[in-house]
Each structure stands twice: as C-alpha cells, then as structure tokens.
From Swiss-Prot:
GO CC terms, sorted: cytosol
Gene, per the UniProt record: alr
UniProt name for this protein: Alanine racemase
Keywords carried by this UniProt record: Isomerase, Pyridoxal phosphate
Coiled-coil portions: none
Record family assignment: Belongs to the alanine racemase family.
Length: 391
C-alpha cells in the first residue's frame, strides 16, 4: 500500500488566518521526482520564496528527500538560503545590469549567465574577491526570454574558454527552459531538446566542457524521461501541484492549505443584501459567516460570489463582493451548523472535499502557480510535519 502524506488542518492557536505547508508532502513529492528522474540529479527550484511555501523550509525538506541542488531566480534569494545555513549547491540565474556578484562568490553561489555582459560583470567580481566562479550558461532554445541566443553563443563560448584558461571560472552547467511547461507531447519540446543537444556539442567542439546539462521542468521530469540529460529542474511539482492538470495529480500531494477562523455568524432576512454594491440578495432567510481575510491577503477580489470554502466538511458559497479584509459565505437557512471560531478552508489538497488551488485557478482563468504564490498580508505561513498513513 502506498504511503500518503496527511496533515492535520486545525488552526494554530492565536493565528487568524494560516497557510499551512506540509513539509512531509514536499518530501513525498521530491522522492517521487527523484524516482521519475531515473538516475539524473534533481535540482529543486525554490525561487519566489519557494513558490509561496517558504524557500528555506522547503529547501531543507527537498534536500532531505534527495534533491542534490537548489535553484533560485536571484542572488538575493540564494544568499537568503546561505544565511539560513543551507550549504547545498545553489544556482541563481536572473540578474539586473550592474549587479554586484561579490557577495554571491563569497557565499559559494553558482551563477547562471545569459549574456556576455553578465560574464564581464562576474569576472569583475572574480578579480575583486579572488574567488573562482562556478557558472552555468543558460541558452535560449526557443522561449525567447532569458538565455544566450544562438547567434551570440559562439562569442559567448570564446569568452568562456578564455575565462577558463585564466582560472576565473569553472563551467559547471548548460541549461535551457522549455516553452510548453504543461504540454509534454508538444513537438516544440523535441525541437528545443535538439537545439539544446546541438549547443552542448558545439561547446565541446569549442573546448568548453560542462559538467551537467539540464532542460527538464516539472512536466518533462514526470512524463519525458528522454529529456532528463544529467539533471532535472522541477519547480511546481515540488509543491504537489500537477504540472499537467489534465493528467490528474500524477501521484503528487499538494503541500499548502489556506484557512482562517470564522469571525462572526449572523442571520439575515429574505430580501436583504450583502457587502459593497449589494451584488447578492438573499432569496430566503439565511445565515452568514464572516471570514476575516480579503484581497489584501491574496484572496482575489474577482472571486467574489464565485468561490466556495469548506467549513465543517461542507462547501459553502461565497456571497457578495470580497473586501480588503473580509468576505461573507452563505450557511443556508435554519439553525446554523457553523459557530464562531470554526475553521474555514479556502483551498487545500482536496482530500477531504475542500476546494483546491486548481479550482481557484479554473475560476480565475489562470494557473495554480499564481494561486499558491498569492497568500500574504495577515495570512501566517506555518509548517507541520506530515503523519503518514497507508492507503
């Protein structure tokens, strides 16, 4: 029987609203990704504060579960991991002009390079610190975003070869990023893989030998083992959200549950209306619950009158507009089965019938990445180890 991560969802005492992150789910997901990688190393991406889950805590969980390296966008994100005592290899790949790479070199952060200008700035820091830089070159294979374009790649290789000869850099990796993150069968993936393979061979021909090559995102890690190269670079799957929602959960366990306490229960009469603009009017006598979170906390205003929350095991519809600090749900007529202080689950894994981040994404016309990176403000992030049960 498979072990499934289950997290108790009771609110932390004294917390008004909470984003509970199940670190056991993170570990489960990374172990699954390591299995899917089939011998390739796993770089767990913890950028954007761990996709809203907390970079430090999720990085530790990912490393404990078998991830070999960590990936972030910015040097500051990498330095925050170092400041927390994380010593595993960390790669940062998004840099503004004029960045000071010296703190990164002193902290042993690997630098991703997308242009010769970035290489020149890095070499300035190498000279200033006396530290050799470990670099990964990011190449553009079709996304037309970050990365060295094919036309500039030959001159970049020449500059890299010169820097290697001067013992200024160690060429650790070659990386690229996929266009179709959620379509593993899209033929563009194969076009990109071939371009990436060609650029890897071109580097060898020019005397630049990279230790590792990595192209695969979460989707490719889970469904395209032929694209694994030496390392895979999953992001959203680390947090238990399916990189291909049409294929179901793919064995992943969502790690985040967002919930709050019921602040107030009240009754209204048929014909009375709720919240700004009176966009919802009760058709019968009913009971309402007030939830003390709003759009300032990452509860999208556009979900007003459309979202559902789970209270005492039942889904309840939100009614009226979502306000800055609060919104209202309809409990229905009769004697209320919800009391002040009860727990309201806005979204979670869905294992107990509660809405999921994917449900919110469908309502919003967006992706679940945006949903889980949105909780903020008065929503306190907390962590619990999972209990493991047999299914």
């Amino acid at each position: 029987m498979a072990a499934v991560a289950v997290t108790p969802i009771s609110l932390t005492p004294g917390v008004l609203a909470e984003a509970l992150v199940d670190l056991g789910a993170i570990e489960h997901n990374v172990r699954l990704l390591c299995e899917q990688a089939r011998g390739a190393q796993v770089m767990a991406v913890v950028k954007a504060d761990g996709y809203g889950h907390g970079a430090v805590q999720t990085a530790r969980a990912a490393l404990a579960a078998g991830a070999a390296e960590l990936g972030v966008a910015t040097v500051d994100e990498a330095l925050a991991l170092r400041a927390a005592g994380i010593s595993a290899p960390v790669l940062a790949w998004l840099h503004p002009p004029g960045i000071d790479f010296r703190p990164a070199l002193l902290a042993g952060v690997q630098i991703g390079l997308s242009s010769q200008r970035q290489l020149d700035e890095l070499l300035t820091a190498v000279r200033d610190t006396g530290r050799t830089a470990t670099v990964t070159v990011k190449v553009d294979t079709g996304l037309n975003r970050n990365g060295v374009p094919p036309a500039q790649y030959p001159s970049m290789l020449t500059a890299l070869r010169r820097a290697v000869a001067e013992q200024a850099i160690v060429p650790r990796g070659l990386m690229s990023h996929m266009v179709y993150a959620d379509q593993p069968a899209n033929p563009v993936n194969d076009v990109q893989a071939q371009r990436f393979t060609d650029m890897l061979a071109q580097a060898r021909e020019q005397g630049v030998r990279f230790e590792v090559a990595h192209l695969s995102n979460s989707s490719a890690t889970m469904s395209r083992p032929d694209l694994a190269f030496d390392m895979v670079r999953p992001g959203i799957a680390v947090y238990g959200l399916s990189p291909v929602p049409e294929l179901g959960d793919m064995g992943l366990v969502p790690a985040m549950t967002v919930k709050c306490t019921v602040a107030l229960v009240k009754s209204i009469r048929a014909g009375e209306s709720v919240s700004y603009g009176h966009t919802w009017t009760a058709q019968r006598d009913t009971n309402l619950a007030l939830l003390p979170v709003g759009y300032a906390d990452g509860i999208f205003r556009s979900l007003g009158g459309r979202l559902q929350v789970s209270i005492n095991g039942r889904r309840r519809p939100g009614v009226g507009r979502i306000c800055m600090d609060q919104f209202v749900v309809d409990l229905g007529p009769g004697r209320p089965d919800v009391a002040e202080g009860d727990e309201a689950i806005l979204f979670g894994p869905g294992s107990n019938g509660e809405p999921t981040a994917q449900d919110w994404a469908d309502l919003l016309g967006t992706i679940h990445y945006e949903v889980v990176t949105s909780p903020r403000g008065r929503i306190t992030r907390t962590y619990r180890e999972a209990h493991t049960v047999e299914s």
